[in-house]
Design a protein with these regions (language model features):
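N-terminal Lys/Arg-rich, disordered targeting/topogenic segments
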Residues: 1-23
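Acidic, polar low-complexity linker/tail segments
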Residues: 19-69, 75-82
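Von Willebrand factor
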Residues: 63-189, 194
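Acidic/histidine-rich, surface-exposed loop or edge segments in extracytoplasmic proteins
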Residues: 64-77, 154-161, 238-243
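DG-centered beta-turn motif at the end of beta-strands
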Residues: 72-74, 178, 191-205
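N-terminal post-signal-peptidase region of extra-cytosolic proteins
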Residues: 85-92, 176, 217-225
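Von Willebrand factor type A / integrin I
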Residues: 215-276
């Protein structure tokens, strides 16, 4: 009887040790499953972001988060120092653009103020994460974006160094054309920035400032006023003010104030003007 009792006790121990629940193994499986699930969700979200992005503009298909219009007046050439300063300011402005902000660069080089296609028009794809680099082309887009706008800016500056002085300088007409192309169909709540690189001396049949600024109230009553109207979409405006020796009697605070009044009337706000 004593021996049977010992065998029974031994069998019981084997049952407890060998047939118990393998909690460590279950925890490992559960942890691995959670990791794979999280990875799957991340892949899904990144791929969803890629599918929601326009492959041509790199903007979200729902629209850009912001638009920055850069208009460079090429009716007269810039000197080397002005061109380099303007280039630095444009590059700085583009680099400051937030993710999904579209940058449009136009060159105003036509006598009637009409514009061709933008030299550059892309959205900032944002800063790629480590996972983006592994499973998507965000890093490549970021590199192409920077190389693209730098090439566009360099191309633009090369052109304005070589242009011949034009007979007209239709700044208002060029701005209207650029604004229409860039953001006329934009949702009302999307912010807009405008950077103008110009001497701002309007010279066209609409208005001639080369001999003097004139009173803004007088311009509002003129025949050219109706042709100057444009909705600037609550834009925040910066002027890179290109100074010229032949316009010393025109380019002054009164001239900048004239443009500030014009922008106010067109639903925009002049934030700053810096002479170069």
């Amino acid at each position: 009887m004593s021996r049977r009792s010992r065998r029974s006790s031994s069998g019981s121990r084997r049952s407890r040790n060998g047939g118990g629940t393998p909690w460590g193994a279950i925890a490992k499986v559960a942890g691995g499953g959670a990791f794979l699930a999280a990875l799957g969700v991340t892949f899904f979200l990144v791929n969803q972001k890629a599918e929601a992005t326009d492959p041509t503009t790199w903007c979200n298909r729902a629209g850009p988060a912001e638009v920055h219009l850069i208009l460079l007046d090429a009716s007269d050439p810039l000197d080397g120092v002005q061109a380099e300063t303007a280039r630095a300011k444009v590059v700085s402005a583009i680099r400051a653009a937030p993710e999904n902000a579209r940058v449009d660069i136009f060159l105003a080089d036509r006598g009637d103020g009409s514009l061709g296609e933008p030299i550059f028009s892309k959205c900032n794809p944002g800063v790629p994460t480590a996972l983006d680099a592994a499973i998507s082309d965000v890093e490549k887009k970021k590199r192409d974006y920077e190389q693209g706008y730098l090439a566009a800016v360099d191309e633009t500056m090369a052109k304005v160094l070589q242009v011949e002085p034009a007979k007209t300088s239709p700044i208002i007409e060029s701005l209207r054309s650029a604004a229409t192309r860039s953001f006329s169909r934009l949702a009302g709540d999307v912010p807009v920035r405008i950077t103008l690189i110009s001497d701002m001396v309007q010279n066209s049949p609409m208005l001639k400032q080369s001999k003097g600024i004139g009173d803004f109230a007088t311009f509002k009553k003129s025949a050219g006023w109706s042709s100057s109207l444009v909705d600037l979409h609550h834009a925040r405006i910066s002027i890179v003010y290109v100074t010229r020796a032949n316009y010393r009697d025109v380019q002054n605070n009164g001239h900048i104030n004239w443009w500030s009044q014009y922008f106010d009337e067109m639903n925009g706000t002049l934030l700053e003007s810096e002479a170069i």
